[in-house]
Structures are given as C-alpha cells and as structure tokens.
Amino acid sequence: SFATTLCSQESSTLGLPDFPLDSLAAAVQILDSFPMMPIKHAIQWLYPYSILLGHEGKMAVEGVLKRFELQDSGSSLLPKEIVKVEKMTENHVSQASVTIRIADKEVTIKVPAGTRLLSQPCASDRFIQTLSHKQLQAEMMQSHMVKDICLIGGKGCGKTVIAKNFADTLGYNIEPIMLYQDMTARDLLQQRYTLPNGDTAWRSSPLVNAALEGKLVLLDGIHRVNAGTLAVLQRLIHDRELSLYDGSRLLREDRYMRLKEELQLSDEQLQKRSIFPIHPSFRIIALAEPPVIGSTAHQWLGPEFLTMFFFHYMKPLVKSEEIQVIKEKVPNVPQEALDKLLSFTHKLRETQDPTAQSLAASLSTRQLLRISRRLSQYPNENLHSAVTKACLSRFLPSLARSALEKNLADATIEINTDDNLEPELKDYKCEVTSGTLRIGAVSAPIYNAHEKMKVPDVLFYDNIQHVIVMEDMLKDFLLGEHLLLVGNQGVGKNKIVDRFLHLLNRPREYIQLHRDTTVQTLTLQPSVKDGLIVYEDSPLVKAVKLGHILVVDEADKAPTNVTCILKTLVENGEMILADGRRIVANSANVNGRENVVVIHPDFRMIVLANRPGFPFLGNDFFGTLGDIFSCHAVDNPKPHSELEMLRQYGPNVPEPILQKLVAAFGELRSLADQGIINYPYSTREVVNIVKHLQKFPTEGLSSVVRNVFDFDSYNNDMREILINTLHKYGIPIGAKPTSVQLAKE
C-alpha cells in the first residue's frame, strides 16, 4: 500500500516520481532471505528518495512511511561485511554462495558469478577495505542476487574501484563502456561498418558481446545519456531479451532452452536462424553522479529509470577512513602535513557556502592521493602551493579566491616565506650531463628515442618562471602523472611543452581539438587512397602504441562529452576505438582476444587548455576532468624576466623602448585581471612587436604598436583605456596636438 500511495495522483502533484512497482517482487525476495533487515532500508534501494528529492519531498515520503508503520523503531540491522565467497557450478551455470554477516547472524545466499576463478574478498592489492566500503559491498551482493545495480556517488570518490573489486570477488570479467551525451541507440547495440568490397554489415557493440559471454558491464556516466537512448536497454534489463538491428534475437537462457526442446533443434541450427542465448551470469552495474536537487536540467532519475536498477548511494569517505586509505596507499607521507590537509578539506566539504563547496569538489579523494604522493616524494615541498595548484587558484574568480585564502589561513597552512624573494636564473639551471637532465633541483634520465624525427626542437630562451614551471612538471612527470597546463593565450604553453620534451628527448604526437571534434575523429583519421576510404590511426592511437607523449592542444574547445573519453584512458588505461578495437592497460587481459592494442608503458598525455571564462569561450575542461590530471597554471613572465627574454629576441632594439613596452603591457594585463578590459595581452604580442622592430629599426614605435591594437580601435571605451595606458609609458599612439601636456612652471 505504501507503493500505491506514492503512485497516486496527489503525490505526483507534489512532484514525487512514481514508485517502481515492478521492483517490489525483487525486494521481497531479498527480505525473504534476510528477514531481520529493516524494510525502510530496502525501500531506499528501490526509491532513493534521500538523494532524489528536496527537503519537502523527503518529509512527504517519510510521512507516508510512518503512516504504514514501515518506519522501524531505530533498530537498524544492516549487513556488515562479506565473510566468504565460494564458487559452485551446477549444470554449467557458474554461481557463488556468498555468506554475509548481519548483526550476529550469518546468512548464505546464491548469486550469479563470473567465468574466472574467484579472488578472495579484500585480496586486491590496490583496494583498501574501510568499514563503509565493506558494508556497501555486502549490500551490493544482496541486490546482485536479484537485479542489476546502479552506484551513485560524487566524482573522484572511487565508484569504479569499488565496482572492479566487486567483480574480482565474484570472478567476473569487466567490460567498461563509457557513455557520452550524443550517444545513439546504435552505439549501444550495433554499428554499421563497410567491408573491403563495399558492402555494409552490422558489428555488435561491446555490450551485446558481453551479454553473450556473461561479463559484468560497467556503464560509466549513465547520468549523461539521453533518456531515450537508455530506453533501449529496458528490455535487456527487465526481461533479458534483445532484438538487434540485423534481425538476430537474444533470449534469456531458460526461454532459449524451452524453444530448443519445442522445436527439437540443435544450437547450430538456432544460430543459423540468428537466435542466441544470453549468458545467465551477465549483469550490469551503472555508475552515475547524484542528480542535482531542484534543477530541471539534471533530473536524470525519472520514473522510467527507477524501475531499471537497484540504487546504492556511495557516501563520501569520513575523515578517519580517508586517512586510512591515503596512509595505506602512500605509506611514507609526512604525518603533520596530511593532518592539516585533511582537516582543511573536510572543513570545506562541510560548509554550506556554495563557493567553498565548489572548491571542495576539486579536492576529491583522488586529488588528495596525488598531493600526498608528491609530499612523500618531495617532503620539503610547501603544502600551500600544492593546494592552490590543485584548485588552480590563479584563475579563480576573486570571491572564490578570497574564500580559499581565508580557509587556508584558518587551517594554518602558510605560504612559504622564501617565495617572496625573486629567484635568480643562476639557481635554476637546465643542463644535460652524461645522459641525465637536471632542472633546478630535480633530475631525470634522458630517454633514448627511436624516432628522432618526432622530438620537438624550438627556439626557446630560458627565463626563470618557465624554468620553475618545467621543474614542477618534471616532478609530476617522474611520479607518472599526466599533466594539464592551463593559462591565457600566448603565455608560451606550447613552447614550454616542446622545450620540456626536447630536454627529455621524448618523441611527441600532436593533436588539436576544436568545436566539431567527435569521439570518432579523436581515434581515427579517414583518408582516401586509390579511391577507397582508408582509416588510419590518429596521433592518439599512435602515441599509445609506440609510447610517445601525446600533446592535446586547445582541449577546452572540444565539447566536454568528447574529452570525457580521455578519462577512462588516463585512469584505467582502457578505451574503445571507433573501428571496434580496444586499448587495454596490461597485457594479461589480451590472451586470445583479437583487435586489442596494449598501452606502451612510456605513453603519457600532456593537455593544454585556456583558462575557463569570458574571452576564450571554451568549455570548462578543468571543471569536468581537472582532478584526473596534475594541473599547472602558466602565467606571463614577471617584468624582469620578460625584459631579459625580449633582449634576446631583439638585441639591436634600444633598451628604453623595451622597458616602455614591458611596463605598458604589464599594466594592461593587470587591467585584464581586474576585468576592466576583456583581452589579456600576452607575451606573444610583445615578442611580435620586438621582432618587427629588430627587423625594421627605422619604423616608428607607434605605427608598429598599432599592428597589435588596431583590432580594438572600433570600440571607443576600450580605445580610451588603451591610449591612456600607452601614453602613460610614453608610447605615442593616436596622439593629437591637444595631448601634449606642458610641465607647470
């Protein structure tokens, strides 16, 4: 009766989604095996109202629960942990008997299992058991008995790791499928491809193959997909049946057997008529981020979606558990720094202030692990700079930046006092001696490249800021991180990367994204040979195969649903290419599978992006994927080092002119940072002016400067500001007789 109440007219006017009646049978099955479990808890799985609804909705649902006496009297007997898992095979169906401890009793249930041998629970080396995770896995085991699961949790909190560990416990092979926004039903089930002779044929997608082979499918990012596309999966999830586009049908095992007996046909004959059985242990785990309460755009958890899965919410780790995880993963991290860092992070996570919460999002567990890895490797490093780097505080809006500084000061994380001294270039040297490279205090062995052609070599004048950035990059590079450089246009991101790879002697593959980049063009490049279309590997695939460094430029221009594909590549080393091949991380997974590309151990990715915000009109790449990469903010050089650099570009240009230019541009940049002018003038423009003056020394300064500023002369306000600033430093652009100001007597 509780369920029918929620499906009635009145509750839909309250804006509550309908209750999934179909899932009740499954829930009753679980409660039958575990009679001591609270009913309210099982209802949360079917109908996760605490994440779905705002405050009013929650109160309404809890009122209904009280009315039907389903609100238990506080005796919460929840499953504690999985005690043991044993494999059993009855007539070719692999199952496992799992013993789960609830309160003081142990209950044994049968669940479907995978085709591999089981690993003992908590045997996986990379997974650290904490109390809440043990409990979550035990609950997932209960749902796994009857239905498919959907894990909901914020980004970077370890959903994928839990799902992987769950699969290992039951001996499943995993088939990860990354979902993106413009995915069609065809991408999920079957795609067209062209045979060499020009015929078109259907190729089954990884999802269909997994259903036939009995794997565990991970649908990652189910909150992104269009709801209509997911409706295709409803039949597969509810009835375990599927009709494909080429006319073949997949049936549930028992129906397939009955059909076989009725028609007295063998398996081969049925396969000729394209009827296939779905493997009995096939299961789906969907991973999603929680819906945003109150917004209309992100309500992906609708009534038709609620019937498909059992929902488990993954809470963020409590402080003690997070310390446990970090300490076991990074054993020699300095204790004092770790305590400060965690108390700071949890304080940010618990505040009600929205700006502080947006900062906390960029300090996920994944990011904290990265910071502690660096601290354990370089213990004298400053914690303040590590946190500001993780949040990219250089490009935060002023409100958020001041909130960050205030919270850091409260947590007694201070700025290093030596940082205020102007560092000298002679302290930081880039030198290559007998096969090792030293940048500042960090040294690395030089790579022995097979392809000398692809090692970049550019004109680069050392200046202190760029060398400091490169030293920082080298630290992370040696820790095995993928790098992300964020900065305004023209500050020399490409130059720094090319110089960095030149010093390390690493070959480079280069790919530039744009607004129309799709997932297909990232992985394949079509070209025409002898009148036939031939698909060649894109630089991305080449870099993965040969172990080169992939430089992804303008990463913020591509739609974020495309760049999400990079996430699985960086994190798990897995990715499906547009022609059906797949990239895998370790060669152990290859045995007997064709169409597999193994990642070369030397493969790295360096991503370049502009800062999010107005004049660049990019997507917020940092917001969606920032916590996967190790981030570095690149800025214009300080006036002193910029002057040094310009002297090298224009040795014959008179010194006073260079000083005028540096001072004027310095002021224009600070105006851009305050938001008075839109376009942040960068080093690139000054260098171009100086190059011009070097080549044509007779031309007047004002006419050369106009090459850069003419674009803004149509906008009168901008023009006023520009002319005033340039006059201040004695660059006579657009001067009229009236602007000559005589000194007073």
Feature map (PLM): residue ranges:
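Conserved catalytic/switch belt of AAA+ P-loop NTPases
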Residues: S1, Y193-T194, L216, V225-V292, ...
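AAA+/P-loop NTPase substrate/partner-engagement loops
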Residues: T169-G198, L503-G531
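Alpha-helical lid/collar subdomain of P-loop NTPases
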Residues: S1-T130, K134, A138, P280-R283, ...
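Conserved nucleotide-binding/hydrolysis micro-motifs of P-loop NTPases
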Residues: S23, C157, Q181-T184, R224-V225, ...
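Phosphate-binding P-loop
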Residues: S132-H133, M140-V146, K155, N209-L212, ...
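Conserved alpha-helical scaffold flanking the Walker A/P-loop in AAA+ ATPase domains
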Residues: A138-M141, L195-L218, L265-F276, E471-D476, ...
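The Walker A (P-loop) glycine that initiates the GxxxxGKT/S ATP-binding motif of P-loop NTPases
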Residues: G153, D220-G221, G487, D553-E554
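Walker A/P-loop
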Residues: M145-Q181, V232-Q234, D239, H482-L513, ...
